[in-house]
């Protein structure tokens, strides 16, 4: 899935809700080489909210590791008040225009995201850089 831009953040969260996603994996940074790759579609700080017309997304907890950031989110449908927990992984060290020289850390990252996915019995919603 392509990362959302500012005008498509609400649509992104609608897809997350409709697909019953519990895990989001982001392989790029928000900005690379000074260019915005996608809009910051979640709040990076605990207890902050992102509000769209249909959903409220609350950041519950943020864990920073050397190669990734793991953010625990809760999305709530404003109409039904139903909510769901989401784990968001942002990979920090994927090179902008190439493959990593050492893939051991990335293999560990994949294994860890798969453990989380299997725990909630859901597919992963991948977020990659925008395609022009």
Curated annotation (Swiss-Prot):
It comes from the Viruses. Residues 1-132 form the Tyrosine-protein phosphatase domain. Signal peptide: none annotated. GO terms for molecular function: protein tyrosine phosphatase activity. Pfam families: Y_phosphatase. Belongs to the protein-tyrosine phosphatase family. This is Tyrosine phosphatase-like protein N2. It comes from Microplitis demolitor bracovirus (isolate Webb) (MdBV). The gene is N4.
